[in-house]
């Protein structure tokens, strides 16, 4: 039997998603918890591997099991075995041809900035702090230059292992909600550090250091060295993964659950 789970986690204390020796990873914690409940070794596949410090409210995984358990075992039971900063949001039996990564048609991220002169306290690790005043409207207009299927070489990490730099950004918006500036971006898939590199460049537009047309120039250059610095991991959330409707997966609120602007 193949089961899909919706996963939420706070990435501050993990060295990213992927299982690694001698360091904490989200994958390791989930596989350990699932193996206990299933009473056999479980390996999981995810929709998108997040970097160290990156969070998720809409991660999706799948695993195969021979265990006959009530569905509550895969939600309440797993949550009882997990640390407080990782949680299962839903569970759903899926066809054997479902794959958390390869069946996905889109991923959506939100990047949340606390834009005030002084740093926050309560949400210090849940948002990115940027003290220079930001013009969200200018950032939003600049971001529209990135829409569509394009070569995003200028926004990929040097260590990116993707075979192609082409990605299709379906939607991108930047707006202000009080003290917060929020980037909301959806694409068929993302290159390594792509969202953080886009945000790092949009910040320079937001401060007025660069004109909004500069974003298009970066894209055309196909050169990572001409774009802005990589934005911090704090404040980045994988909030949604889209699948064909016939899989019938639940669609909870996007999150972060404390911030649904």
UniProtKB/Swiss-Prot annotation:
Q: Matching Pfam families, A to Z?
A: PseudoU_synth_1
Organism of origin is Tolumonas auensis (strain DSM 9187 / NBRC 110442 / TA 4)
Q: What Gene Ontology molecular-function terms does this entry list?
A: RNA binding; tRNA pseudouridine(38-40) synthase activity
Q: How does it assemble?
A: Homodimer.
EC top class, as a word? isomerase
Say if the entry is tagged with keyword Isomerase: yes
Binding residue positions for substrate: 109
EC number(s) per UniProt?
A: 5.4.99.12
Name of the protein this chain belongs to: tRNA pseudouridine synthase A
């Amino acid at each position: 039997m193949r089961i899909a789970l919706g996963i939420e986690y706070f990435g501050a204390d993990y060295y990213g998603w992927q299982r690694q020796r001698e360091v904490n990873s989200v994958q390791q914690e989930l596989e350990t918890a699932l193996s206990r409940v299933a009473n056999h070794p479980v390996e999981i596949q995810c929709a998108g591997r997040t970097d160290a410090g990156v969070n998720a409210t809409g991660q999706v995984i799948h695993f195969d099991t021979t265990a006959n358990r009530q569905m509550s075992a895969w939600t309440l039971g797993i949550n009882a075995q997990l640390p407080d900063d990782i949680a299962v949001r839903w569970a759903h039996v899926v066809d054997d041809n479902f794959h958390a990564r390869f069946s996905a048609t889109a991923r959506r991220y939100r990047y949340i900035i606390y834009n005030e002169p002084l740093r926050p306290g309560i949400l210090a690790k849940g948002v990115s702090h940027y003290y220079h005043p930001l013009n969200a409207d200018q950032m939003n207009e600049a971001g529209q230059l990135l829409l569509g299927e394009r070569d995003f070489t200028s926004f990929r990490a040097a260590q990116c292992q993707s075979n192609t730099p082409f990605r299709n950004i379906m939607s991108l918006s930047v707006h202000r909600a009080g003290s917060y500036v929020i980037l909301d971006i959806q694409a068929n898939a993302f290159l390594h550090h792509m969202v953080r590199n886009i945000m790092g460049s949009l910040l320079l537009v937001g401060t007025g250091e660069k004109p909004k047309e500069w974003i298009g120039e970066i894209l055309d250059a196909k050169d990572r060295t001409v774009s802005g610095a990589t934005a911090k991991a704090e404040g980045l959330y994988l909030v949604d993964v889209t699948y064909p409707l016939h899989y019938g997966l639940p669609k909870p609120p996007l999150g972060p659950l404390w911030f649904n602007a």
